[in-house]
Amino acid sequence: MVTLGDLKTPKTNTWCPGCGNFGILMAFKKALIDLGIEREDAVLVSGIGCHGKMVNYVNINGFHGIHGRALPLATGIKLANHNLTVVGFAGDADQYNEGWGHFAHAVRLNLDMTLIVHDNMVLGLTTGQATSTSQQGFKSKSTPFGVIPPMLNPLAHALVSNGTFVARGFSGDMLHLKGLIVQAIKHRGFAFIDVFQPCVSFNYLNTYDWFRNRVYKLEEENHDITDRKKALEKAFEWGDRIPIGIFYNKERPTYYDNLPHIKDEKLTKLPTENVDITSTINEMT
């Protein structure tokens, strides 16, 4: 059985003191322990941003990709070996800006993996520019007069793209977030969690206290997680009360279920000896 000690790495953590990433890191580690997933059976993929250092701080197989491209990497890994537990980590700018096209199609295809987005509503690694989820009026280095367009709603987009598991967490409530991650990894299909992750250095608006005074848990209000329309209504709640928890959870066939050549056997186990691709190469040259 894997332990916290097993998941520790020798890398020095360089996140700012009080960063919301710490709550996500611990929630993820504890979720792996609760699920009994061995290190060799899991792969972590990340993009560019403060969140990207997750691959340095969890002692499992990892791939630190380029900006916005965690999902294509995760897709390839899962296609090659569908027995692996594949978890992608991204930031709000990373996934909802450069990686937006990948996000929409990963949800639609129902790829069997988990995506956890560290949503601090600001570009932290580059010292404080606005992102797609920054609130209107938010003043930053890139928007000195305030953000003009309305903020992107990733949960609503996931729901209308026929997402099968859509959730939101808060890194200030680590135990609740751990439970969401456990359920997401258990889900057979594309599981998406947007996590409110306060940036203590550059987001002066969306602080820990700001979230604590507003968030409430859907499970405490008897929310029906199988009702997509109700989930969509909840996704648009924003203001004095903001819901967290599982908005929607209803399985449907995954993308891999319709690929007969990998349905029963993983690609990494298929024989490659005596394979001649000369004719294929000739057709393309």
Regions found by a protein language model. Give the residues of each.
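Short, surface-exposed, charged loop/turn segments at secondary-structure junctions
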Residues: Q129-Q136, M174, I181-F190, N203-L218, ...
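Glycine-rich beta-alpha junction loops
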Residues: I48-C50, N120-V122, D173, F196-F202, ...
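Flexible, low-complexity linker and terminal segments
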Residues: M1, P10, C199-T285
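Active-site diphosphate/adenylate-binding microenvironment
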Residues: L4-I66
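Active-site glycine- and acidic-residue-rich loops that bind
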Residues: D94-N97, G169-K178, H223-R228
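Conserved thiamine diphosphate
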Residues: T131-A184
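Short coil/turn connectors at secondary-structure junctions
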Residues: K11, E38-A42, A80-V86, R108-M113, ...
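Thiamine diphosphate
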Residues: S46, C50-L123
